[in-house]
Amino acid sequence: VLIKCGEKHKLVKSSELFNSEMSYSTFSYVVTSSKAEQSVTSAMVNVTSDEITKVAILTGYDEADYSSLTSMLTRNNFDVQEANITTDEIPEDAKLAVIFAPGRDYDQSSLKKLDTFLSNNEKLGKSLVFVPNTQPDQIPELNSFLEEWGMSTDHLYNNTTPFWSAAEYVDEDYSSVITNKSIPVSVMQSRPIEILKESESIKVLLESTENSGIYPVDAAEGWQPEESDLTGPITLAAV
């Protein structure tokens, strides 16, 4: 399917119109459902938009698989590019950089590139999305850098779901576009966020339930929280 508007066009492949899975009885792919509306709508937005936001996914530190994130961003009309921050600069025309669950700590050279990107010649206006991994102690330098920009992460304990946390929407400006806010947000192995600087530009997006608290880093095996340890709700996502 070719979508065209003026001088811009977008080709939607047949594989982008349907969901399919392998049939091991026939050793061929079988269509299971349609995603045509989503794909065609995304293409229409692409060719009619005056500006497309560029996203740089930062690599070079043994990041977790981010293919699902890339697909979601692409479907929603973002121009997604990879940038190995150990060897390359972050693209100047990128509005957003993403660090997706790095397995190793950032060195000073990479942190300087991050700072240069976010400072943007003192004009600011850039954004960084940080998705932490499950081992925060592996990245002390990156954690220190994030603290300088006003946020830090910790360990979360949820009294009802130790691995999957039920989160609730907070900021109305962001949640107002959601059709059905009664559908809960489920976050796997979520990490609490502490806002270190008071700022009107920092918005809390998601919070944990009241039955949650901070899991001590030095907790003994089999640790169970007291009622006083459950200090929720706790910030799980902020911008």
Segments predicted by a language model, with ranges:
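Short, surface-exposed patches at the edges or C-terminal ends of soluble domains, predominantly
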Residues: 1-239
